Swiss-Prot record:
Keyword annotations of the record: Cell membrane, Membrane, Transmembrane, Transmembrane helix
Domain of life (superkingdom): Bacteria
Subcellular location(s) of the protein: Cell membrane
GO cellular component term of the entry, any: plasma membrane
Similarity comment: family membership: Belongs to the UPF0324 family.
Protein name stated in the entry: UPF0324 membrane protein DVU_0123
Subcellular location, principal: membrane
Organism: Nitratidesulfovibrio vulgaris (strain ATCC 29579 / DSM 644 / CCUG 34227 / NCIMB 8303 / VKM B-1760 / Hildenborough) (Desulfovibrio vulgaris)
Amino acid sequence: MSQNVISQPVEAQQSFARAVTESLPGLLLVCAVALVASFVAPKLEAYPLFKTYLSLKDFILAIIFGIIIRNTVGVPAVFQPGLRYSTIMTKTGIVIMGSSYSLAGLVSVGAQALVFIAVFLFGTALVMMWLCRKVGMSTPLAACLAAGMSVCGVSATIAIAPAVKAKNEDMAYSIAVVLMFGLLALIAFPLIGKVFNLTPEQFGAFAGVGIVNSAQVLAAGFGFSQEAGIVAGIYNIGRVVFLPFVVLMLAIMAAAQEAEQGNEVAKINKWQMIRDKFPLFVLGFLAIVCLNTAGVLTKPEVKMAKHFMEWAFLLGFASIGLTTRLSDLRAAGLNGFLFGFGVAGLKAALALAAVLLFMS
């Protein structure tokens, strides 16, 4: 009995040490890509093209360099375990980002943000379900596309899939469409922001509702400017807060469509779905905001937190790039690309129009 009790902590320590050892090569690769991106970005600013139009700051370059490495020389298996932490890194950055806001500042940005987000999220989801039905797509595929294109990209697609009994092919198709537009948005959105001379607040809102995938929202926002990245982050948080409610709406719509077709439909537990899909890291962000509002964080600590936030995002984006396989985008095919790009492009155009009209 006592030997078993003693052996458990030892086994846990060995397991932790093994996980660290396995993850180390990948984490070092992520750090190397992030460092190269942070070194190259200021050099590009010396060229008028990049300074005036193409905002290829380190956040965007980290993703681009990662993608180039992954899809040219490849990433050997020994590095794979260390690339699993992209989501943890980006969510850590979002939590730390709370140090940049007080409750009053959050409310001033958040009130308008919630209106924009609600209109675009639910509007996009409803339009996508209607369009997909018109072109004859299956209900599960339609729900996956609607969630991915309206809320937060890949995460939303994964969240809705079990609720609508989506197949792996449905998820792959939806994720491919989301990633294709997200990669294009990394370059196009900052360029559009410069052409229309958007303020950081305007661009943050534009990226926050116009770009499909969460990681690209943050990368494009910080790629435009530090202030725009913070605002885009607030919009991104608002989007993921709405995630369980959009998933619930789509699940109910999908169930209704399946019932119309005479298929058996499982009962939906609404409160359990909302609870299970709620993003807990948002609570961490709000906790940091409250600490900053209460004056617990000193100015040096806030400055240090800003550096931690930047590096958390930079490492997360590098990891995302290193795990992005362009071959996976073939799952959507040409028709899927055109369909998804058309909807995402329309959403982006409407987002730009709304920002110019209501935030001038």
